[in-house]
Swiss-Prot record:
Gene that encodes the chain: CDC37
Function: Co-chaperone that binds to numerous kinases and promotes their interaction with the Hsp90 complex, resulting in stabilization and promotion of their activity. Involved in both the HOG and the PKC MAP kinase signaling cascade necessary for adaptation to stress conditions due to high osmolarity or cell wall perturbation.
Name of protein: Hsp90 co-chaperone Cdc37
Record's subcellular location: Cytoplasm
Pfam families in the record: CDC37_C, CDC37_M, CDC37_N
Amino acid sequence: MAIDYSKWDKIELSDDSDVEVHPNVDKKSFIKWKQQSIHEQRFKRNQDIKNLETQVDMYSHLNKRVDRILSNLPESSLTDLPAVTKFLNANFDKMEKSKGENVDPEIATYNEMVEDLFEQLAKDLDKEGKDSKSPSLIRDAILKHRAKIDSVTVEAKKKLDELYKEKNAHISSEDIHTGFDSSFMNKQKGGAKPLEATPSEALSSAAESNILNKLAKSSVPQTFIDFKDDPMKLAKETEEFGKISINEYSKSQKFLLEHLPIISEQQKDALMMKAFEYQLHGDDKMTLQVIHQSELMAYIKEIYDMKKIPYLNPMELSNVINMFFEKVIFNKDKPMGKESFLRSVQEKFLHIQKRSKILQQEEMDESNAEGVETIQLKSLDDSTELEVNLPDFNSKDPEEMKKVKVFKTLIPEKMQEAIMTKNLDNINKVFEDIPIEEAEKLLEVFNDIDIIGIKAILENEKDFQSLKDQYEQDHEDATMENLSLNDRDGGGDNHEEVKHTADTVD
């Protein structure tokens, strides 16, 4: 396996050999000053991070209290400070306050800070010459202050992100930790009993040790499954993991420890798309189950990615899996983590339900837009148009009587009404509701009794006159030709008669 040397790019100091300084500057002093500068910058960066984290956390607690007051406390009580204090103490821990290395131990509690805010806002209104006893003015002042806090919080988080990136870009002694380690312990002959493992849904210590020992002894390098050519493709193991029921966490943990390569972005996303497939078939139970299993993979992968290991490290990934299940899933003392996880699962389930309905509706609309194949009558030649011919209902002619009989018996009543209007649009409108096979048979009936005819279209009077002249000329030519033929025939007879007479005389 190739060794990744990129992590050494983060080291800020090099050895003496490649440090170039001015000839008048002592190299050792320069390196010492450089070290000192780096340590000072690192210390300042860490202090800034701690201060901003404390600030963001404090604003979060204060906003929570202010929002609860604005939502649940009657507006008329906003100017009554004792009522505000009573409400705060009833809904929040009155002793809760900000803590940390950079926080003054004597700092006021969160409830006291909110009370001070109300007092200060009332004083500010008095200074501006406004009525500080007006609940609506107090509410407006609180909302303005709340907006300022939000703005400051956004800036603080933005600055924090920059500091985190800067910190992660360099290696320091804080980042050094034990990778692989082993030790021997003498067996205890007597004395205190070893701690007994408390009953838990988690894997037993023995089972976990067996899995980790297998990983440690395995000499075959593992890689994350990634079907780059087919992002929707699921590995057999991943599909099997998706079939594990929601509440079988121990089984899920054991399965992941034994199938580490499936914890990849591609497999996690492919499993989530499988949930879409189940939902489109109306299977809510399997949809929720597959989403739940996909989220387990997603949370574990996200934690592992924070370690910035660009390949599959079996021991590290196994530690992450065990830590996740221990701290989030099986942690009964602090259930917030599991609640947050399940909330995320539920949100994705609702999202997939909503998206599936939209996709089904779009497919239905598209199908309706394409429509059913129908027959429409239209002339294909611009110089002609179709006309509707009705049979003669009063005629005694056998042919016409036959057409009338076919018209009344083989043509649907609705189509008969459309034909009687002699309007082609009305006929086409009826054709829209007739299946293609039936419409084709109806066209054959039309053809048999000459319902639809074709007539030529003359664009103007000049065309009509030209056609008329052409007809008359053709008629005249035909007449002259007949006369000529008659004359020729008559002359031939006389010649024969003369000839025959001469023969007789001779």
